[in-house]
Amino acid sequence: MTKFVFVTGGVVSSLGKGIAAASLAAILESRGLKVTLLKLDPYINVDPGTMSPFQHGEVFVTEDGAETDLDLGHYERFVSAKMRKSNNFTTGQIYESVIRKERRGEYLGKTVQVIPHITNEIQAFIEKGAAASHDGKADVALVEIGGTVGDIESLPFLEAARQMSLRMGRNHCAFVHLTLVPFIASAGELKTKPTQHSVQKLREIGISPTALLCRADRPIPDDERAKISLFANIPQDAVISVWDADSIYKIPQMLNEQGLDRLICEELRLDPKPADLSMWQKLVNAQENPEHEITIGMVGKYVDLTESYKSLIEALRHAGMHTATRVNIEYIDSEELESGHLEVLAPLDAILVPGGFGKRGTEGKIRAIQYARENKIPYLGICLGMQLAVIEFARHLAGMADANSTEFNLETEHPVVALITEWVDREGKVEQRSADSDLGGTMRLGAQRVPVKEGTKARAIYGAEVNERHRHRYEVNNHYVPTLEKAGMVISARTPTENLPEMMELPESMHPWFVGVQFHPEFTSTPRDGHPLFKAYVEAALASQQRKGA
């Protein structure tokens, strides 16, 4: 039977519950246990797919095409299990499911209430999510409950966790509570009162934490831990100090050294082998002792909020670990490039345009792409970044000065990028598509296997086949591909059934390293294995740096 560890948060949000849960899961996995993770989001949105990145950060896409919380990206980077749609659910999904059941008469005319109907549904969703990995035989499922204790939105989830613990009995559920211990500079001391109140609030709900993770900007002294232990009624060895680290990959070792995994295993009556964190130590060592250093310019419109590009930033760091390179990222606001200021691109070793939606800032991105192409700076375009590379190429090298995407200009004379429902086929006819003819109707989501053309950079990077995840509404218009290819562009991967361009590149005679991909490779990069595309990109940046210095 799967055992559960519920991870809750108190005092303030954004303390790093996702990193803490993923780190504990990584330690338990290193002890030989089969682990999986779930994220419960208290907001009423059905999923984060239509939420602004400024509000919610990155939307992480799973292999089965679910648009989920960015914490699922952390989970996949820390453990071997692949996340699925059932690993993340929201209040919106719970209420939607309960209301559908009520309409179908499944409650036999009873008054539908938060307790028991909503809380029972939450428990059913938790058990379904835990069974999605390891053929339903996970040893431990870590369940992160979003929000903070005391939020009205979180109450049904906390109540469901309490009921689940009661129903399953002792030694089947553990609770880890993450809280803040702020340092007050004017007083010169750490303050434990917010943590005391947070634990009291949790105990009022009926939950007593097995362990307390105390976040601070510095290690918490033993006397403060003893004070927290006394007032929170938790053994002192269960009060874990979690201070700010310069790398999230140091957290598993930090928690292991203080015995968090031992406490959890004792509570759940598990007796696995000792933890082996040598892989994490090796990765941290590679990160802290690079032989090279490069600067990559990331040109986007969400550059003030790096949470919007969380997986991409981590993928570049992974590539750095596997190439002994410190990867510095320069965030460049694409709107500032629209009025000039291209000189900020000159010192860069490589340029990257990530995915995105909407017209704002696109002309600045196109100018950055043109600069990269003309100045032979390594370029990687992801999703929108590939589409804009096609537009830039069509305008300046293929004789289509008005080339654009119908996302930005419905009246463009040359729609080289078009909506999934309005492609022009090889005969010049508008081809209408539906949910039956394309994954997700107007949004292509999830993983897809695609063959790769021989003799291309893509083939050297990926081999014969690429299997990556998608999240987009627009595609390169096949009607214009022959013209683009005649001008020198190489379409190096196409979907097997629709024949849609998945990867584009420029030949070495035109540019040393210029690649665009319609998919999102950042979602499959892990610190353990890195990612072949990002590794090749960093190596191209190093080669460019050497050419500049020669």
Curated annotation (Swiss-Prot):
Region: Amidoligase domain, residue numbers: 1-270
Binding site for L-glutamine: 356, 384-387, 407, 473
Alphabetized InterPro entries for the sequence: Class_I_gatase-like, CTP_synthase, CTP_synthase_N, GATASE, GATase1_CTP_Synthase, P-loop_NTPase
Domain Glutamine amidotransferase type-1: 295-547
Active site annotation, chain numbering: 383 (nucleophile), 520, 522
Binding residue positions for ATP: 14-19, 71
A Gene Ontology BP annotation from the UniProt entry: pyrimidine nucleobase biosynthetic process
Gene Ontology MF terms in the entry: ATP binding; CTP synthase activity; glutaminase activity; identical protein binding; metal ion binding
Record pathway: Pyrimidine metabolism; CTP biosynthesis via de novo pathway; CTP from UDP: step 2/2
Binding site for UTP: 13, 191-196, 227
SUPFAM superfamilies assigned to the protein according to its UniProt record, in alphabetical order: Class I glutamine amidotransferase-like (SSF52317), P-loop containing nucleoside triphosphate hydrolases (SSF52540)
UniProt binding sites for CTP: 13, 151-153, 191-196, 227
PANTHER family noted in UniProt: CTP SYNTHASE, CTP SYNTHASE-RELATED
Subunit structure: Homotetramer.
Summary of the function given for this chain in its UniProt record: Catalyzes the ATP-dependent amination of UTP to CTP with either L-glutamine or ammonia as the source of nitrogen. Regulates intracellular CTP levels through interactions with the four ribonucleotide triphosphates.
Protein's recorded name: CTP synthase
Organism this protein belongs to: Cupriavidus taiwanensis (strain DSM 17343 / BCRC 17206 / CCUG 44338 / CIP 107171 / LMG 19424 / R1)
Gene transcribed to yield this protein: pyrG
